[in-house]
Amino acid sequence: MQTITLLALLACIAVPIFADFDHLRARRDVVEASGEGSGESSGEKIVESSGEGSGESSGDKIVEASGEGSGEGSGASDAVLESSGEGSGENLSNGIVASDAPKDVKALTASEFAVSV
């Protein structure tokens, strides 16, 4: 009887020590870099960079870069890429690219739209 009690007590102590408590840990999904640096991330994270740097990410992400930097996003999933200032924005996956740089945009009239559809 004492052996069973000691084994139960030992199990109550040993199980929490060897158990995996990753779901209880606080995770930092936002990596922020400012100044002349860069922020890099992989997986489902958000990378924000400002100043003369760049933000790079792969996977499910949002990349924002401002100032004299660039933002590049590549991965197998959809991405949102925003760039402003003297930087450039490139996206190698199925996503949306928004930039403050002037671009040649042609507005379609109703008849042109009907013809293109």
UniProtKB/Swiss-Prot annotation:
Q: Where are the transmembrane segments?
A: none
Specify whether Oxidoreductase is a keyword of the entry: no
Q: Where is the composition biased (Low complexity)?
A: 32-41, 48-57, 75-95
Q: Which residues form the signal peptide?
A: 1-19
Keywords, A to Z? Glycoprotein, Proteoglycan, Signal
Q: Where do the record's glycosylation annotations fall on this chain?
A: S66, S70, S74, S84, S88, N91
Show the segment(s) annotated as Disordered. 31-97
UniProt superkingdom: Eukaryota
Protein name as catalogued: Chondroitin proteoglycan 7
Task: Look up and give the organism this protein is from.
Answer: Caenorhabditis briggsae
